[in-house]
């Protein structure tokens, strides 16, 4: 299954808030059909929704998510926590969390168009796995800096996770350590994703 490129608000209405997918929020009460579901949700449906939240928030294909679950399953620690750490340490997500891009698809485009340097080298792979003490900067040209400047100006500095630091004047970010579970910016039960 390929990456989702359709209407984003439909996914947000169904799955809840997905800050990595879009900044838009659906209007309350507009075109909301009354849904008559039984009181008890089916277990399969709950697990599927949790998996879809991860997929759409991080912009992954089905195969990529399966690969991350497989890697997390081999770890000796909690599989769900390792899965979230792997996803949060992707370069496109780090750019989004630093405020250098307004959404994860926007961050992916910055990386693909070679505007981003990691430790002084151009990286054009959005799934690049960042490590602690990695320094993420923009290319030293006006166009790259202007693209990032717009996002940094509109981002909220209070939402910056504790494992990252950002220097807004030099367009530079630093990964200090691996993320704790409580700083994940998405309400998801990762154990249900692993069970799926």
UniProtKB/Swiss-Prot annotation:
Main location: plastid
Function description: One of the primary rRNA binding proteins, it binds directly to 16S rRNA where it nucleates assembly of the body of the 30S subunit.
Pfam families to which the protein is assigned, alphabetical: Ribosomal_S4, S4
NCBIfam families assigned: PRK05327.1, rpsD_bact
InterPro entries membership: Ribosomal_uS4, Ribosomal_uS4_bac-type, Ribosomal_uS4_CS, Ribosomal_uS4_N, S4_RNA-bd, S4_RNA-bd_sf
Sample GO molecular function, one term: structural constituent of ribosome
Subunit structure: Part of the 30S ribosomal subunit. Contacts protein S5. The interaction surface between S4 and S5 is involved in control of translational fidelity.
GO cellular component: chloroplast; small ribosomal subunit
Region Disordered: start-end pairs: 15-43
Name of encoding gene: rps4
PANTHER family: 30S 40S RIBOSOMAL PROTEIN, SMALL RIBOSOMAL SUBUNIT PROTEIN US4M
Protein name listed in UniProt: Small ribosomal subunit protein uS4c
UniProt cross-references to HAMAP family, sorted A to Z: Ribosomal_uS4_B (MF_01306_B)
Keywords annotated in UniProt: Chloroplast, Plastid, Ribonucleoprotein, Ribosomal protein, RNA-binding, rRNA-binding
PROSITE patterns in UniProt: RIBOSOMAL_S4 (PS00632), S4 (PS50889)
A GO biological-process term: translation
Occurrences of domain S4 RNA-binding (ranges): 89-150
Annotated family: Belongs to the universal ribosomal protein uS4 family.
Protein localization: Plastid, Chloroplast
UniProt cross-references to SMART domains, sorted A to Z: Ribosomal_S4, S4
Xref: SUPFAM superfamilies: Alpha-L RNA-binding motif (SSF55174)
